[in-house]
């Protein structure tokens, strides 16, 4: 699931990190949240209709913006994930937004719902504050996407994430983000010229999440591939592709 990451999930990421995600990636492995709307492309993007877009932007956090994704996970099976911006308010230096995520897996009786709060700063950086899943709240410290100016194509950028979860438990992860550069991508929603970002999330326990995310200007995340590695062996994987995007 995204973060919707965030990651996506975890974010992907991170949230940063979401797809494989809010459920904790099963079997006690670290959750991956892929943050939707990670930094967009550095050059002109191409919409599904082939129209060049203006200079790239970070996540289009407008009230009512809605993304629908097809999810195919080796752990959870196939499903559909809907992500919607449900609240936006101005704050010092940017805006604070709330994102509602609903993941419905094939054969499940009810969807898995969770929310993410983040701040979209004027410089293009995004900072995640918390994620709420099934009544449980996970808070973050130093969890953010750097501003576009801070990402240099081909040069990895590393940061540290601290998460506080149930019963005050704290975990630390090291996140490396690399802007690979322009990349063409085709998903059910259309064909796009995107920016490909690669993330590596390493937990203190030794597990590692490898995340590839294709970002399109004005839309955000259109495709995410996540692989969870435990003890140097692939443990789980997921692919998330955009089927539709509706502006609020």
Model-predicted segments: where are they?
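C-terminal motif of bacterial Sec signal peptides marking the signal peptidase cleavage site
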Residues: 21-24
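Solvent-exposed helix/loop surface patches that form functional interfaces
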Residues: 120-192
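Acidic, serine/threonine-rich low-complexity disordered tracts
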Residues: 26-115, 163-248
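Solvent-exposed, charged interface segments at domain starts and junctions
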Residues: 15, 102-133
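Bacterial N-terminal signal peptides that target proteins for export
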Residues: 2-15
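Solvent-exposed, flexible loop/coil residues
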Residues: 5, 62-63, 144, 149, ...
């Amino acid at each position: 699931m995204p973060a919707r990451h965030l990651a996506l999930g975890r974010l992907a990421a991170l949230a940063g990190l979401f797809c494989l995600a809010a459920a904790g990636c099963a079997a006690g492995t670290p959750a991956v949240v892929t943050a939707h709307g990670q930094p967009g492309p550095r050059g002109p993007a191409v919409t599904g209709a082939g129209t060049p877009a203006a200079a790239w932007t970070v996540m289009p956090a407008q009230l009512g913006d809605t993304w629908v994704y097809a999810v195919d996970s080796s752990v959870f099976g196939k499903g559909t994930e809907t992500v919607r911006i449900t609240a936006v308010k101005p704050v010092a230096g940017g805006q604070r937004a709330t994102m509602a995520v609903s993941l419905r897996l094939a054969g499940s009786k009810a969807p898995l719902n969770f929310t993410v709060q983040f701040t979209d700063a004027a410089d293009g950086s995004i900072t995640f504050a918390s994620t709420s899943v099934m009544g449980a709240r996970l808070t973050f410290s130093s969890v953010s996407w750097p501003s576009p100016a801070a990402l240099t194509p081909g040069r990895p950028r590393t940061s540290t994430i601290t998460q506080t979860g149930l019963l005050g438990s704290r975990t630390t992860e090291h996140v490396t983000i690399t802007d690979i550069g322009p990349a063409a991508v085709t998903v059910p929603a259309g064909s796009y010229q995107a920016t490909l970002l690669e993330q590596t999330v390493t937990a203190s326990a030794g597990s590692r999440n490898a995340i590839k995310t294709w970002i399109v200007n004005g839309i955000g995340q259109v495709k995410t591939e996540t692989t969870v590695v435990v003890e140097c062996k692939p443990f789980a994987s997921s692919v998330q592709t955009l089927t539709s995007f509706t502006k609020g």
